Amino acid sequence: MLAHLRRVGLSLNRQIRSHIAFNSNDRMSSTCGLDTDIVWMDLEMTGLDIEKDKILEVACIITDQDLNVKSEGPCFAINHPQEVYDSMNEWCMKHHYNSGLIDRCKSSDVNLEEASNLVLSYLEKNIPKRACPLGGNSVYTDRLFIMKFMPLVDAYLHYRIVDVSTIKELAKRWHPAILDSAPKKSFTHRSLDDIRESIKELAYYKANLFK
């Protein structure tokens, strides 16, 4: 098990290094004045192991720098063979079946490649290439799955991320009273709901921490 975890860690490190190097070469290709938008994405997966788990749902919203929604993008449930759903752990089984997501996936006619292409097309129409960061909660996890399963989408985004969970952790340490009135999560475990909650949460921190 330890050897396997080390191999996974090395694989992730290689992916991240090559990813940053690739995007760093094109930092100057962004269009001046249009790089302040944030691309919010959220994925629902069969688990958190990128070596074996799959993307079940993907959604995207674009905001300006002040967190005003400029465009609400696509939200796709992705169809998979039955064995993918059967391989989920107990937590995912409970929440994804209860939310109705698995039923949506089973009835969806969109596969992973099609979802990736449609998300990429949406980004191409709304933001310049490699200009806007990815936003979300614990969004580094989503980024790893995007890097592996949606590489063209990953390559279109800026290499930086805006992780709301980082701000929450800092507030907990430096301004704990701020968290008492922070927006509460509904825990629907659906992509669009999670994005909207992340935007609302960051707007709260913006108003109360970044005065």
Curated annotation (Swiss-Prot):
Keywords: Exonuclease, Hydrolase, Nuclease. Residues 38-202 form the Exonuclease domain. GO terms for cellular component: mitochondrial matrix; mitochondrion; nucleus. Gene3D superfamilies: Ribonuclease H-like superfamily/Ribonuclease H. The active site is at Y159. GO terms for biological process: nucleobase-containing compound metabolic process. Belongs to the oligoribonuclease family. 3'-to-5' exoribonuclease specific for small oligoribonucleotides. PANTHER family: OLIGORIBONUCLEASE, MITOCHONDRIAL. This is Probable oligoribonuclease. It comes from Drosophila melanogaster (Fruit fly).
